[in-house]
Amino acid sequence: MKQDRLTLTAGFFPAVLMGLLLLLEGVQTRVELTPWALLAAAAGAYVLPTLILRLIPGSDGERCRLRFRPFKRQAVPFVLWISLAGALLAALANSGLSLLLGQSYYAESAGWQPGSIWQGIALAVLLPAVMEELFFRGAVFSALERGGTWPALLLSSAAFAMIHGDLSNLAGPLLAGMLYAYLTYTLDSVWPAIFAHLVNNSLYLFLSYAAKTYAALGVWPYMLLIALFLFCLFLALAMRSLEKLIEKGRIRRFQYRGLRQGLINGFISPGMWLLLILFLVRVLYQ
């Protein structure tokens, strides 16, 4: 089965993004960048490959859709509840993986500085939510989708997780990426994914601050128990909202066409292997 030109090309773009981000990290070690200069450089690293991928036509002349269209207002409760549940699941998954690796994920990554609150929000919350979703769900997922919906979801989510380049922060982005791709496809809009990503990053920033402030008091395990309870609550509310949307036919169903062949094409893609190599190099270097 011949692979679509756009799908094959899109497989290289996460590796291109990883290369740009590694280059930016290298520049940071040699040149002191202000937070706003870093913000602009990081935004450029995402915008450039997104625009290029958007302009590349497929074998049939069609281009990938960034899905800027608004989603149905009836889906707002579902988006809200599943975003909260997804953020908590990602936090719990990262915490569990960190325990297995003998690390304390949020305590080590807590870099909250009250004097730079707006810079922290821009760099840790707004920029990743908007730029990463436009690239991974708007461009990459849409391009890979031509080879099958499920392969596109799995491959774009795996690439999304590897871009974060940290074993302790791998499980959360993988699960979150699958949720964001699901929202993008079923609601045919990138905005629910951006909102869910904003919620996730906001929770990450809060937990980083809480870990740094209260970890010495020994309350972190109790916070995880509270997070687990809230996850179950929000998930139940989300599933109830989703059930109503399905009953009224207001949500798209996933297509299983070409699942096996799409996965084979994706996992033997040279672009995905290049990304995996860059990810392993970054992990070993760290």
Where are the language model's segments positioned?
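Alpha-helical transmembrane segments in multi-pass membrane proteins
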Residues: 16-57, 221-229
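Transmembrane alpha-helical insertion/packing segments
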Residues: 1-38, 126-127, 132-135, 208-209, ...
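Interfacial transmembrane-helix boundary/kink motif in multi-pass membrane proteins
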Residues: 2-16, 60-91, 250-275
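Transmembrane helix-loop-helix hairpins at the membrane interface
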Residues: 118-285
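Membrane-water interface of transmembrane alpha-helices
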Residues: 47-60, 95, 232-249
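Juxtamembrane helix-loop-helix connectors linking adjacent transmembrane helices
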Residues: 27-36, 62-134, 142, 281-286
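Residue-level signature of transmembrane alpha-helical entry/exit and packing/kink sites
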Residues: 5-14, 34-42, 71-79, 116-121, ...
